Structures are given as C-alpha cells and as structure tokens.
C-alpha cells in the first residue's frame, strides 16, 4: 500500500474567459496553482496567491479586494473558474466580473494572471 500523505493536497486549475458564464465562453488563459507542500505552478504569483487563499480559508468569495484600485464602469464581462482540490476537498468555483480591471481588483493576487 502507498504511504499516507503528510499533508492534504491543494492543487487548482484557474481559467479566464470573456463572457457572462463559463458555459458560454472558451478559456483565454489557464494557470495551475499547487499550494501544498509548497507554492508552485504556472500562476505568475504562486506564493502570494497561496498565502491569500490560506488567509481566506480556501473560500474564493472571502478574498479581500486589492487596495486602491479604480476601475471604469465598462461592461465587458470576464468569467473566472477554479477547479481542483483545496486541503483535500474537491471544489468548483465560477465568478463573473464586470471587466478585467474589476477581476484584477477582486483579490490581491489569486485572480491576477
């Protein structure tokens, strides 16, 4: 038998697409983010994104907005999806932002890729 893992896995795939829902769009960009045992993946700020997710308890709706960001009221919807495992629990998340600026302001680093 395989040895027991010393940590619960945290491995995610994040995508961004233009549109109001993931079902109605194709991903424009995708990154991987692994947070255990250490921050790795193709996410450009893996360390910061993992730290931010840990502070939020893996709850994407609880991520803190980036400070001091001003965005236009332009409506060009961007949808973010997250699928994978966070601390051993499967998760699937989808959120639509009014535009790219609002998406980037939705977290300090998690959605900035």
From Swiss-Prot:
Its main location: secreted. Disulfide bonds join 35-50, 71-101. PROSITE patterns: SSI. InterPro entries: Prot_inh_I16_SSI (IPR000691), Prot_inh_SSI_I16_CS (IPR020054), Subtilisin_inhibitor (IPR023549), Subtilisin_inhibitor-like_sf (IPR036819). The keyword Zinc does not apply. The record marks 73-74 as: Reactive bond. It holds the Pfam family SSI. It is found in: Secreted. Homodimer. Belongs to the protease inhibitor I16 (SSI) family. Inhibitor of subtilisin BPN' and trypsin. This is Subtilisin inhibitor-like protein 2. It comes from Streptomyces rochei.
């Amino acid at each position: 038998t395989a040895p027991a893992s010393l940590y619960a896995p945290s491995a995610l795939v994040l995508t961004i697409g233009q549109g109001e829902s993931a079902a109605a769009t194709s991903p424009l960009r995708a990154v991987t983010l692994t947070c255990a045992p250490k921050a790795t993946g193709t996410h450009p700020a893996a360390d910061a994104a993992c730290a931010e997710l840990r502070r939020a308890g893996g709850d994407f709706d609880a991520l803190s907005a980036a400070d001091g960001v001003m965005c236009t009221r332009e409506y060009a919807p961007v949808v973010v999806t997250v699928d994978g495992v966070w601390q051993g629990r499967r998760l699937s998340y989808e959120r639509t932002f009014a535009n790219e600026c609002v998406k980037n302001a939705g977290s300090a680093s998690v959605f900035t890729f």
